């Protein structure tokens, strides 16, 4: 009788091995689910960035206002008689910059 019990126990362990540690076992499935969650989080951040860039591209294609704003902010270009006021966040500097040309 003991031989039957021990052989059944060995067979039970042999059957459980692929379920837990095999190629498609629970541990691999759990790890893959975690990787999918991380990738979905990255994808959502990239989707937000893409939406912002898409809006920038649309603004640059449709009107000159976005081009003027970029020229002013990034390169300091302003028109004759125009004022450019840039308010910086408090953590960087509390001063305001005013330039007149």
UniProtKB/Swiss-Prot annotation:
It is a single-pass type II membrane protein. It is found in: Cell inner membrane. Residues 22-101 are periplasmic. The keyword Coiled coil applies. Residues 33-53 form a coiled coil. Residues 1-3 are cytoplasmic. One of its GO terms (biological process) is FtsZ-dependent cytokinesis. Keywords: Cell cycle, Cell division, Cell inner membrane, Cell membrane, Coiled coil, Membrane, Transmembrane, Transmembrane helix. The keyword Zinc-finger does not apply. GO terms for cellular component: cell division site; cell septum; plasma membrane. The chain crosses the membrane at residues 4-21. Part of a complex composed of FtsB, FtsL and FtsQ. NCBIfam families: PRK00888.1. Essential cell division protein. May link together the upstream cell division proteins, which are predominantly cytoplasmic, with the downstream cell division proteins, which are predominantly periplasmic. Belongs to the FtsB family. This is Cell division protein FtsB. It comes from Polynucleobacter necessarius subsp. necessarius (strain STIR1). The lineage of its organism: Bacteria, Pseudomonadati, Pseudomonadota, Betaproteobacteria, Burkholderiales. The gene is ftsB.
